[in-house]
């Protein structure tokens, strides 16, 4: 197994991305842990695990931050979690394939706060569109590239 792990913020993970993650685990012999406040329906194995946390705001996020190590990879669309992962020396990837950086996380946090302000004022902001096949390909590519980069870095 590799010297780093893959953590998945599974509460809001689109189902079509699970197969991408499981294939990557097989291909790279990578340990994956799905963390959610509900049963994610993943069959555990030597490399695949799931942790069910108590219901509550950000419990799964906190579990990931508490358990992850530097160089681990985290799949999340939660911007504050991505910021914590980066701060702790990990790599965070959005389910649409964007690899978070210190710069783009700050920009996304500002945008998120602005959108929260708009929603608080009663403005309907809508949500993101469903994950497309193109998004799935971009996520798969970003995940593969990140795993390979981490393999070289930790070898």
Swiss-Prot record:
Coiled coil: none annotated. PANTHER family: UPF0178 PROTEIN YAII. Residues 120-155 are annotated as: Disordered. NCBIfam families: PRK00124.1 (NF001095). It comes from Acinetobacter baylyi (strain ATCC 33305 / BD413 / ADP1). HAMAP family: UPF0178 (MF_00489). This is UPF0178 protein ACIAD2644. Belongs to the UPF0178 family.
């Amino acid at each position: 197994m590799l010297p780093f792990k893959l953590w998945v913020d599974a509460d809001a993970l689109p189902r079509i991305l699970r197969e991408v993650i499981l294939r990557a685990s097989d291909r790279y012999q990578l340990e994956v842990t799905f963390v959610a406040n509900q049963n994610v329906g993943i069959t555990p194995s030597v490399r695949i695990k799931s942790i069910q946390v108590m219901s509550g705001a950000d419990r799964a996020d906190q579990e990931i931050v508490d358990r992850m190590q530097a160089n681990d990879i985290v799949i999340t669309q939660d911007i504050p979690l991505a910021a914590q992962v980066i701060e702790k020396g990990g790599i965070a990837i959005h389910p649409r394939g964007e690899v978070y950086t210190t710069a783009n996380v700050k920009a996304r946090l500002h945008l998120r706060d602005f959108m929260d302000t708009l929603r608080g004022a009663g403005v309907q902001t809508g949500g993101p569109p469903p994950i497309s096949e193109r998004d799935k390909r971009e996520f798969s590519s970003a995940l593969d590239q990140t795993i390979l980069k981490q393999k070289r870095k930790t070898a």
